[in-house]
């Protein structure tokens, strides 16, 4: 089975399944350690087993917290993926991202990186678009890149914008696309 990486179609669901598996394994391990305490006669070892169980909770919680944040976001609908897929040959395209900061949880079904800007489609109409654009642009400027991210919440507008983008030429490539790629994937969980 091929591993689905961050930014590839199907990442949200694959990542969710992987995290559920890890959290379940931790929960079973913690339960085994706690139950086995009752079969050990020495008090010192019982205490060590209790400490072990408590310490196992920390990585389990570390895996569970992003899972809880991303729980309600499913993989991008196949129809939308099929509509954006033709642009993969022309531009750098990412799917199934969830961009977060302390004030923002924004699902991004598709992100296209182009020298004229970063174009993101967010299906959640309740996201404060101006605030989200400001956050992403500040991060880009902090990395000495052009802060020109555009977030669209209307599917039709997003697809029209992609259709209007001109093809990349060698003169357009200033090398910033790979840096922007790292930044956008770094912002996503």
Label for each model-derived stretch:
Residues 1-94, 101, 134, 143-144, ...:
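Surface-exposed interaction regions that form or flank ligand-binding interfaces
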């Amino acid at each position: 089975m091929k591993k689905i990486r961050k930014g590839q179609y199907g990442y949200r669901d694959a990542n969710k399944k992987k995290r559920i598996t890890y959290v379940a394994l931790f929960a079973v391990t913690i339960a085994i350690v706690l139950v086995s305490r009752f079969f050990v006669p020495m008090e010192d070892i019982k205490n060590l087993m209790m400490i072990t169980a408590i310490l196992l909770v920390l990585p389990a919680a570390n895996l569970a917290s992003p899972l809880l944040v991303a729980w309600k976001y499913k993989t991008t609908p196949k129809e939308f993926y099929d509509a954006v897929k033709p642009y993969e040959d022309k531009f750098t395209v990412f799917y199934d991202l969830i961009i977060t900061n302390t004030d923002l949880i924004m699902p991004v079904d598709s992100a296209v990186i182009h020298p004229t800007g970063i174009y993101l489609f967010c299906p959640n109409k309740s996201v404060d678009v101006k605030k989200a654009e400001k956050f992403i642009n500040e991060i880009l400027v902090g990395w000495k890149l052009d802060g020109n991210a555009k977030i669209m919440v209307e599917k039709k507008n997003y697809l029209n914008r992609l259709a209007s983008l001109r093809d990349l030429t060698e003169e357009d490539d200033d090398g910033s696309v790979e840096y922007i790629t790292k930044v956008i994937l770094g912002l996503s969980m």
